[in-house]
Amino acid sequence: MSVWTHVAGIIRVDGFRLNESDPEPNWDELIGKELNWDDDSEVREVREIRKNYHKCSEEFMPCGSEGSLKKVIWKNPDKNSLASYTVSVFGDLRDYDDLVKIEKWFTKVCSKLWVRDAVITADCELGSRFTAHWDETKEKLVGN
């Protein structure tokens, strides 16, 4: 029987976008790459990761046996607004129950960004769960 962990998080990111030449953030470097098990990629590294998903490197978002978490980036069209981006992270991780690892990953992500607000919840079907928000004054996740 498979164990599933369900994750939903959102990060509101502040930033200055003063002109068109300002570079876009590299979200894969800041948050992690997505890994999709249905990709037809025959790249040796990807094949190796698929076999050893529990050892998924830090360049990827947390991974279960059928893929990683996903991310969606919303860019605020109002360039005069300090609230520049909203990042959604979400997914269902099969054969994954390490909520501490998810919490550490989210903390690492938030510490790299200028976070206005951030919250995450993760629920493992084995009965463990956490919900936390980013406390910018303490620069850490604070649980409920």
Please give the residue ranges for each predicted region.
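Charged interaction segments
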Residues: 24-26, 30-144
